[in-house]
Amino acid sequence: MRVSEVCGLRWEDLDFEKREISVNHSLVYARWDGDGGKETFHVTTPKTEKGTRIIPMMDEVYEALKAEYAHQEETGFCTTKIDGMTGFIFRNRFGGVLHQGPINRAIKRVYTSYNDAELLKAAKAKRKPLLIPHFSCHHMRHTFCTRLCERETNIKAIQEIMGHADIQTTLDIYAEATDEVKHEAIKALQKGKDIF
């Protein structure tokens, strides 16, 4: 999911019985005409027409969302109202909604902290440090899609899960098969079929 789609998720967008997420809007923090030139939150339609979709939850996502729901039953649900919508799942430390800026800053704090410690350890051990490169929410979306492409052969299913308007986007940008995956694909073909 795009970070704006994740930030815009509301409890009513989840179907815990079917383990599905309804992606039908995005929460965007930007400058808008009529808002006096300041940045504000607005609910918008997804980035593309294909962006409106139903996606299945992975087991880890299901468990994390159930745990968050239980936590919010004790601590209170988000009551922020934006463009008539409320009940947003992901909150900042003050109980308001999140946007990509603070999320990307939190990610940066994690890898910067690790890299700082790794630089010291590597210097003490007189070895080359193993550093985590810069990454953001979008990089995680890209990585998710790449891993999905490595494990799934139905490109149409991948397009629908990712919400790409054009299947060419799925093929061009995300289908980055590694040499190892290409070798595994040929081995699987040979094992599963008598092709000669």
Where are these regions (language model features)?
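Short, charged phosphate-coordinating catalytic segments
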Residues: 1-33
